[in-house]
UniProtKB/Swiss-Prot annotation:
UniProt-recorded name of the protein: 4-diphosphocytidyl-2-C-methyl-D-erythritol kinase
Binding site for ATP: 97-107
Record-linked Pfam families: GHMP_kinases_C, GHMP_kinases_N
Active site residues per record: 14, 139
Species the sequence originates in: Pseudoalteromonas translucida (strain TAC 125)
GO molecular function per UniProt: 4-(cytidine 5'-diphospho)-2-C-methyl-D-erythritol kinase activity; ATP binding
InterPro entries xrefs: GHMP_kinase_C_dom, GHMP_kinase_C_sf, GHMP_kinase_N_dom, IspE, Ribosomal_Su5_D2-typ_SF, Ribsml_uS5_D2-typ_fold_subgr
Pathway: Isoprenoid biosynthesis; isopentenyl diphosphate biosynthesis via DXP pathway; isopentenyl diphosphate from 1-deoxy-D-xylulose 5-phosphate: step 3/6
Biological processes annotated in GO: isopentenyl diphosphate biosynthetic process, methylerythritol 4-phosphate pathway; terpenoid biosynthetic process
SUPFAM superfamilies listed in its UniProt record: GHMP Kinase, C-terminal domain, Ribosomal protein S5 domain 2-like
Lineage: Bacteria, Pseudomonadati, Pseudomonadota, Gammaproteobacteria, Alteromonadales
KW ATP-binding (keyword) present: yes
Family: Belongs to the GHMP kinase family. IspE subfamily.
Length: 284
């Protein structure tokens, strides 16, 4: 199977089942604790090996300049780090909203690093890829390692956990929230004590939520609407909100009644990232 020159790979969504901010470091980064779960839904990336050194990114790039695109940055980083002479053509089918808090850009970057590590035969370990990925964003390492986990520190210290499978209806209220704006805002809660004891009692708490609701009333409106069905929560710094169910039918019922001004999808949680599952099926 070592002669594979093209394949496609999912870049899955993530949800933060809780997000606590414990403090702000001198370098501006925040100490946090958050529980990540992956979903079996996401962007789709197609990779085609090229003998020319160029990295070409096509598809749903939303007008982002190539040099600012995290997919391009990830490919260039690995190519430069490992002195690769080959190039690649990458096509993106975008399903995850930008500025939604479901990890779209970070997931795209991680899946690119994982895929090209195979395609270019660079043979880096997951730890080495995660170290590279951290240069692209604090959430990239969790997508590289690809396991449900509690993240500590600035998000780079991962404690693997096993979560029961759940179904989610995730709603994007067509509002883009800037992560940088939230984390630099003076009103952000930054003093939550670190978890001691059972982390499961902290499920569905998010220190960013009250501030985002204040700055983006549509998020509060979304959370209130979802409350008709189940306890609702915001993921990351928003703007996506979600509700959790035991069955697909329950999640589908929410999606079927979604106001036409919003977008949404349903998906089940998985303890191993679909990107890892698909790569194993292709290369192992």
């Amino acid at each position: 199977m070592n002669n594979i020159t093209s394949f496609s790979l999912i870049a899955p969504a993530k949800l933060n089942l809780f997000l606590h901010i414990n403090g702000r470091r001198d370098d501006g980064y925040h100490e946090l604790e958050t529980l990540f779960t992956f979903l079996n839904y996401g962007d789709e990336l197609s990779f085609e090996l090229s003998d020319l050194p160029a990295i070409i990114v096509t598809g749903d790039t939303n007008g982002i300049a190539t040099t600012d695109n995290l997919i391009y940055k990830a490919a260039l980083l690995l190519q430069t780090q490992c002195k690769i002479k080959q190039g690649v053509k990458i096509n993106l089918i975008k399903r995850l909203p930008m500025g939604g808090g479901v990890g779209g850009g970070s997931s795209d970057a991680a899946s690119t690093l994982l895929a090209l590590n195979k395609l270019w035969k660079t043979a880096l370990s997951l730890d080495e890829l995660a170290h590279l990925g951290l240069q692209l964003g604090a959430d990239v390492p969790v997508f590289i390692h690809g396991k449900s986990a509690i993240a500590h520190g600035i998000g780079e210290q991962l404690e693997q956990v096993m979560l029961e499978q759940k179904w989610y209806c995730v709603v994007f209220p067509n509002q883009h929230v800037s992560t940088a704006k939230i984390f630099t805002h003076p009103e952000l809660k930054r003093d939550t004590p670190k978890i001691s004891g059972d982390w499961q009692q902290h499920i569905l708490t998010n220190d960013c939520e009250s501030l985002v609701k204040k700055l983006c009333p549509e998020v509060e409106k979304t959370l209130q609407w979802l409350l008709k069905y189940a306890p609702s929560k915001m993921t990351g710094t928003g703007s996506c909100c979600f509700v959790e169910f035991a069955t697909q039918v329950q999640a589908q019922d929410v999606l079927a009644n979604l106001p036409h001004t919003w977008q949404g999808f349903i998906a089940s949680s998985v303890n191993t990232s679909p990107a890892h599952t698909e790569l194993a099926a292709i290369f192992d």
